[in-house]
Amino acid sequence: MYIDTSASSRMTDNKGSVITINGGESAGNSPPSQRKSSTSESPPELRILCFDLTYYNRTTQFLLSCAGVFFLYILYGYLQELIFTVEGFKPYGWFLTLVQFGYYIGFGLVERRLEGYRISGGSFWNIEPEPRCIPMRTYLILAALTLGTMGLSNSSLGYLNYPTQVIFKCCKLIPVLVGSILIQGKRYGLLDFAAATCMCIGLAWFTLADSQMTPNFNLLGVAMISGALLCDAAIGNVQEKAMREFKAPSSEVVFYSYGLGFVYLFVIMLVTGNFFSGFAFCLEHPVETFGYGFLFSLSGYLGIQFVLALVRSSGAPIAATVTTARKAVTIAFSFVLFSKPFTLQYLWSGLIVVLGIYLNVYSKRNKLTLADVRQRIKQFGAKVARSPSRKFLIEV
């Protein structure tokens, strides 16, 4: 799910501005210029579903968003791995994706009705959702990419350790950077390439350790999660262009992307015959599949809302840092809650990936080119040459 960061810049422009109830009442007796100033200082709206966090201070908004991200996505990862521990479930990752998409359709309908109820009021069940903003042909592309991302990601767990899957997800910068250079002709700074290099080294080391420690390691899982990353990287470009051009709310994008993705996958599974075998297996284990699948889907859907709120309140770099920390905690929980072999190579390679993510976040605020590096080296050399200690050492 791509996250639009335009709201975060609006938040930065209005930081520290809070309007009290008394101030709002006194605005009616103020001159027009004062009323205009009061309106312009209103903080940007921040909502998580039907909960309005607009008039909380920024620290409270940040803490609430962080708490939601950590709790929901740690629960999401735990339930995802728990479902795949059910004996005989590993071949049915695509059916889990179908169940997840079905739940997302229901959640999306409820969210769109909540938005309509908040805007127009009236009876909740008689609310008509807002008309679609983005053309259907764009959603057909988004649905295919969403299906590739979620389906390949879920199915890869049948062949990979969960920590390995998470490490791959941390390295989405690599396909994004390569695709942006080849397709859009973008230019990146030195820190971006350093970040991608660290991620590649850490990822290769982690995968090598996993292949040595895990007896059921399969390169098909690596291919699946790599395909999921490529689809996820493409989703960002398509969603960014569509949401900015047509001013579509995120609830609409989620609803149509997963709704059409459900139709795609349902037809494919009917044609291949995998639907009936997956459905029969889930009927034999309804709690472990449909029950856990509901909580798994609900935590993922709500997690998207909290990440969006975190981006709007604190900005994309901070949101990226928080989600990276969440992934590190998820990996730690995976080793603690599910028995699996461990080696220190996991730790060191994971730290290299984290370094790459930090460099990527740092580069968003501090653009560094090769010319900047040469300039700083010259400045450092000149400073050392003028240093008294340097002169003393030469004289000795």
Curated annotation (Swiss-Prot):
Residues 27-42 have a biased composition (Polar residues). GO terms for biological process: 3'-phosphoadenosine 5'-phosphosulfate transport; heparan sulfate proteoglycan biosynthetic process; transmembrane transport. It comes from Drosophila melanogaster. Glycans are attached at N57. Its main location: Golgi. It comes from the Eukaryota. Mediates the transport of adenosine 3'-phospho 5'-phosphosulfate (PAPS), from cytosol into Golgi. PAPS is a universal sulfuryl donor for sulfation events that take place in the Golgi. Essential for viability. Involved in glycosaminoglycan synthesis and the subsequent signaling. May be involved in hh and dpp signaling by controlling the sulfation of heparan sulfate (HS). The modification Phosphoserine is found at S37, S40. This is Adenosine 3'-phospho 5'-phosphosulfate transporter 2. The chain crosses the membrane at residues 66-86, 91-111, 140-160, 163-183, 189-209, 216-236, 253-273, 290-310, 318-338, 342-362. GO terms for molecular function: 3'-phosphoadenosine 5'-phosphosulfate transmembrane transporter activity. Belongs to the nucleotide-sugar transporter family. SLC35B subfamily. It is a multi-pass membrane protein. One of its GO terms (cellular component) is Golgi cis cisterna. Residues 22-42 are annotated as: Disordered. Keywords: Developmental protein, Glycoprotein, Golgi apparatus, Membrane, Phosphoprotein, Transmembrane, Transmembrane helix, Transport. It is found in: Golgi apparatus membrane.
